[in-house]
Amino acid sequence: MTGLLLVLLYHFFKTAFPGGFIGVDIFFTFSGYLITALLIDEYSKNKKIDLLGFYKRRFYRIVPPLVLMILIVMPFTYLVRKDYVASIGSQIAAAVGFTTNFYEIITGGNYETQFIPHLFVHTWSLAIEMHFYLIWGLLVWFLSKHHDNVAKFRSLIFTISAAFFAGSFLSMFIRAFFVDNVSTIYFSSLSHSFPFFLGAMVATMTGIRETTARFKKNVRLWSTKRSILTMVLSFALLLLLTFALKFDQRITYLFGFVLASLFSTMMIYAARVLNDQTPNAKEPAIINYLADVSYGVYLFHWPFYIIFTQLMSNGLAVLVTVIFSLIFSTLSFYVLEPFLAGKSVKLLGLNLDLHPYQKWLYGGGTLLGLVTIVTIIISPAVGDFETSLLVNSLQQAQTNLNRTHTVTAGDATALSDVTVIGDSVALRSSASFSSLLPDAQVDAAVSRNFDDAFEIFQNEISSGTLSQTTVLAVGVNSLDNYQEDLQQFIDALPDGYRLIIVTPYNANNKAQVKEVRDYELTLADTYNYVTVADWYKAATKHPEIWSGTDGVHYSDSDTTGADLYVKAIQKAIEKSAKNPAKGESDS
């Protein structure tokens, strides 16, 4: 439940809990422990492992809730714009085929910065989990066929787990130094599977029914207080990581994920000791209930949250998401899963006989299936948002090409002394740049951050092509370490040049963007050659341009948003021209 809590906090309140994504690693560690411990117990009891039975149990636990989630979510997609169902057929195929992680890598997905988030991107973790179940179950079964000593069997599993853990972790550690998009590491079945094997190592040292002599000794030697304090300490350390880690920081991949997994093993071990120390204690019913529905809540919460945040405030969206997720995950665990497995159905202490209602159940499932099929058929391959960005990119390229031809022909005055280095917001404003600032050189791209922009900035300085005024419009993708990032532009700016910084805006992250904006205003006070184009101020004054948007890219139903954006930059350019350039004194 700790893992689910951190994931929910991260998704619902990412600014306050930036490292909550480690909740998935807690899931992975616990799954590795639980599956391995159960397999060892089965071998200890029966001297063999029923591989097909293992796969069957995993299938009934994982697949029905997943399919139910997809079927239930599809009708809700008609409440939001079609961008959210673009290529939905491919997303569904990846989800039910347990290849979402590969799908996101191939399509260039970024876990944190998708402007139109995929509704089923969260099933990437389910894909890696299924890969682990398939391979690990087969390997442990194979080992059980060739060993008849439980102690040696445990020892061998520990050794192999340790080797797999080391290989997977080293893969993440080394790749962290060489990739530009860390999501390719995060989504990787190879690089991100080490928590499972760390959990498996703990399973060989503890077990569930069949435990080790060392573990039994610790149960006797540890006080109950020590067990509880160890659990509390491990939870506190995980919470500390939740506040300290950032998704795109290298240290997260070098040490963050492995520390989260290690702290999770501490919690698992202490919980197992405490469980055996208090055999007659009963867990509160609410704890058992949350443990039962946690998988379902994980499945349902993300698509519901994405949809509801487009319809209401974040706080209300969180409340509605939690309610809907609990309702459907409860029905899934207590009704659907046992019904499909041929077991008795029991809900709220009542035995339910669903056989008289089979036609209604199958009819409802068929109807939802038809809705899903129709949605797949009518959904666009590419959403309007991506299409508009593509069109703007082509327009930008053509405009820059025309300017190059003009300069080559000898008319040097055709190219102004203003260059805009921008992100997708600037790219979305290409048409307005052409009409309001036709002489400005615009270089904009999707998901561009300060690091990308600084590379362009340095290249222009080195090649002697830097315009007299550079407009830096990339802040919304660079909300971490912004002070250092901005300072490098100021320090590198040559004498005789001016810098304009466009303040960022994100309706879903106002607190952090305001913090960045306030700091950027201080830079204009400190350096007379730095001017601020206050897009944040213009954006907050015009809420009408944000209706039905992602909160970062204004509505393109008309040119209002684009014109406001470019006019803010235009105003700053005019103001900057009246101020001295770097190295010049005030007149």
List each model region and its residues.
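A general structural detector for well-ordered alpha-helical segments in enzyme core domains, enriched
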Residues: D485-F489, V516-E520
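Hydrophobic membrane-embedded alpha-helices
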Residues: T2-T123, I128-V297, W302-P338, G342-K346, ...
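Structural recognition of the beta-strand scaffold that forms the well-ordered cores
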Residues: F28, G97, T419-V420, A440-A444, ...
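Extracellular/periplasmic envelope-modification machinery, especially enzymes
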Residues: P338-Q468, L479, A507-E515, L521-T522, ...
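Glycine-rich, phosphate-binding/catalytic loops in enzymes
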Residues: I26, S144, L436-D439, Q487-F489
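A short, conserved alpha-helix within the catalytic core of class I
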Residues: Y482
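Short, conserved loop/helix-junction motifs that constitute active-site signature segments
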Residues: S462-T465, I490-G496
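Structural alpha-beta junctions
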Residues: A492-I500, T522-T531
